[in-house]
A protein has these predicted regions:
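P-loop NTPase motor domains
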Residues: 1-15, 19-39, 43-248, 314, ...
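Repeat-unit-sized solenoid/scaffold elements
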Residues: 7-9, 82-96, 118, 256-279, ...
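Short C-terminal domain-edge/linker segments immediately following a structured domain
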Residues: 29-32, 44-48, 83, 207-214, ...
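Short, glycine-/Ser/Thr-/acidic-enriched flexible segments
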Residues: 55, 184, 232-233, 267, ...
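Long, charge-rich low-complexity segments
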Residues: 135, 240-255, 368-376, 381
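Short, solvent-exposed amphipathic alpha-helical segments in soluble enzyme
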Residues: 194-198, 279, 299-300, 336
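Conserved ATP-driven motor cores of ASCE-family P-loop NTPases powering translocation/secretion/packaging/pilus
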Residues: 250-332
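Conserved P-loop NTPase motor module
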Residues: 315-398
Length: 398
């Protein structure tokens, strides 16, 4: 993530932040004491935008947000329901019934289904579209949970500004986007929102790419987008991968300037075809035989790597293999606090706002001097609080 953020501006990221960890601050997990660690917006300021599904939660946590995400019922398609089958316990016949409703009512299919159900006339709808009444009734009961989510609104209440178009403007301006879920961090909300937004953004990228290829105008070339998703097996299991946009993106191999960065603790749940498309894998300690077999599929010398995976330090080491390295290599991962310190040190080199507004001499003085005149590491540590204070003066702390 840090590599992408500090890159040359040609790559942007969209992070679906289920647990509110990437954007502003998160709880410190190591060291034996409770505390906070800085998120991407805190570290990189205006290079990162935060959108939220839960404005109240963001205000409570004093998170500076750039916009709130609201989804209207007419923005939800039947394909967006496919990843929810396990969460909603939807039978395949109910999904087939949804397709019948969509055929009859188009983008208003969900609103019409809810209207008939609320009126107690599922039987009338079933007769009208030729669907099984029991399947349609089950579909109504399950999707009622979706309609009751706080960020879902009727079609006539959707905001005038399309939130997806707003996010796209940020991305095409070179600004990375973190979408935090606040207290709406249920798997149901995560699967639904990630699929809806990623599907629409992918559709826009397809149009932009086709326009660029037709004109070969350099100004129309889309920025490469990396979409970050957690719990990837929920989107990319053998069933969902064939129906969701994430399976499409994985199979297209960056054809439309969109790539996936997938995070998962159960790689064995991911479709084999999708696993074969992953260019670079960063693997922490694994003990489950199925998971080990999944990540090593198609890799030379799997037996040797198998023993390495089982012996990795669970919090300090990872195995990197694939396109990014000439051969599999074990890497010691730095603590996040150490990474934050390094980012503070590198701000003057990487962030234009700091280059423009904090002169190099001032930055050097802040970094290497402290009141007690200590040298070496002590001077470095002593200057950090001053750097952070100056950072807040530059970008503000809402």
């Amino acid at each position: 993530m840090r590599w992408v953020t500090l890159g040359n501006g040609k790559v942007v990221t969209l992070v679906f932040d289920m647990h509110n960890e990437y954007g502003w601050k998160a709880l410190k997990e190591t060291g034996g004491t409770r505390g906070e660690v800085k998120g991407l917006r805190y570290l990189f300021g205006s290079q990162v935008a935060i959108f939220t599904l839960d404005p109240e939660s963001s205000r409570t946590r004093q998170v500076p947000v750039d916009g709130s995400v609201v989804i209207s019922l007419d923005q939800i398609t039947v394909d967006d329901i496919a990843p929810l089958q396990d969460e909603l316990r939807l039978h395949q016949t109910a999904v087939e019934a949804a397709h019948l409703v969509y055929t009859r009512y188009g983008k208003n299919w969900l609103e019409q289904l809810l209207a008939y159900g609320d009126a107690g006339d599922i039987k009338g709808l079933a007769e009208q579209i030729g669907a099984n009444r029991e399947s349609l009734a089950a579909l109504y009961r399950k999707l009622k949970r979706v309609a009751d989510l706080p960020f879902i609104v009727p079609s006539d209440q959707k905001p005038k500004k399309d939130i997806v178009e707003t996010i796209m403007r940020y991305l095409q301006s070179g600004i990375h986007v973190v979408l935090e879920f606040g207290r709406q961090g249920s798997m149901l909300a995560y699967l639904l929102v990630a699929n809806i937004l990623a599907r629409r953004i992918h559709e826009m990228y397809v149009r932009m790419t086709e326009e660029y290829l037709a004109t070969m105008d350099p100004t129309k070339e889309p920025r490469q987008l990396v979409i970050v998703i957690e719990e990837a097996h929920k989107f990319l299991n053998p069933y969902a991968a064939k129906q969701t946009v994430f399976g499409t993106i994985a199979r297209e191999m960056r054809k439309y300037y969109v790539s996936l960065l997938i995070i998962d603790q159960r790689p064995s749940g991911i479709d084999d075809e999708i696993l074969s498309q992953i260019g670079t894998k960063i693997v922490a300690q694994l003990n489950d035989e199925r998971d080990i077999q999944a990540v090593l599929t198609g890799v030379s010398n799997p037996a040797g790597l198998r023993s390495i995976l089982a012996s990795l330090d669970s919090k300090q080491q990872v195995l990197v293999l694939g396109h990014a390295v000439p051969m599999p290599v074990v890497v010691k991962v730095r603590d996040y606090d150490e990474c934050c310190t390094t980012v503070s040190y590198e701000l003057a080199n990487y962030i234009p706002e700091v280059q423009d507004r904090i002169q190099e001499e001032e930055f050097e003085q802040l970094l290497y001097e402290s009141d007690d005149g200590a040298d070496g590491g002590a001077r470095y540590e002593g200057g950090q609080s001053q750097i952070e204070e100056r950072w807040r003066e530059v970008f503000g702390e809402e």
